[in-house]
């Protein structure tokens, strides 16, 4: 009887181990912005995209993230992709990332059409399959050439999103990266936030998968628009949650800046870059502030933005 007891009671089913994923938001700064600042004497020549692309790639490879949201990857005035040389630089360093860049004019077709500082998503090819994707507008306007009178062209903000399937387990999750208008237009930024939450809800509610929303929301925690994010019933700010639970390091509490100034000489104030999650456990959060060699060997911050990184489980 004693030998049969475990069978009679039934062995407790083993829980599948949680999958680990390391994600990052990286505002890489469009090449036209860099060129303008250099031409006006606001930034050193090392800031040019052609001089920084290797450093950007080195930072991505060094941090070894599984999925990365890249903001300001395209040139809005020229209407083209602004990632010149980055895929090649990553590959040359042994990193195998797949790319998703969606045009504002043809959202169903990657890498075609005109671009308006569109976000990109890159992911480790050997770990995930991208099974769905699209781009949605946050400002309520599709064609910036037909904007209502008095509305700025940057009202055409968007969110690029993808649905991924982990190859090893079949687990699925959503990944969204966006940029909003920020402090220069608080009312429009608030509407961006409202629309982003609405869009995300409509996408995720269909199958209730874990999801990540990240972006350069260009606002401080004291901004009214930030309250829109805090009111989200589903998603929560990784930084704020860890801060509330007393799990942030003293260095991250004392220095939460996610940007540096145009000259690259010092960090800027505030935290305009965010990661929100739902359905994930948080292992860690950090802002990567290392310098890397530019084309001439000068150590520089590769971009105006620092990578914001979080290790998660689901």
Residue ranges and their predicted role:
Residues 20-42, 131-136, 161, 171-182:
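Active-site-proximal beta-strand elements of phosphoester/diester hydrolases
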Residues 201-212, 219-314:
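Metal-dependent phosphoester-hydrolase catalytic domains
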Residues 73-172, 287:
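Structured beta-strand-rich core segments of catalytic domains in phosphoester-bond hydrolases
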Residues 69-71, 100-104, 212-216, 237-241:
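Active-site neighborhood of phospho(di)ester-bond hydrolases with catalytic His/Asp-centered motifs
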Residues 28-32, 73-77, 105-109, 127-128, ...:
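Solvent-exposed loop/turn segments at secondary-structure junctions
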Residues 21-28, 56-82, 122, 162, ...:
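Active-site beta-strand/loop signature of hydrolases that rely on acidic residues for catalysis
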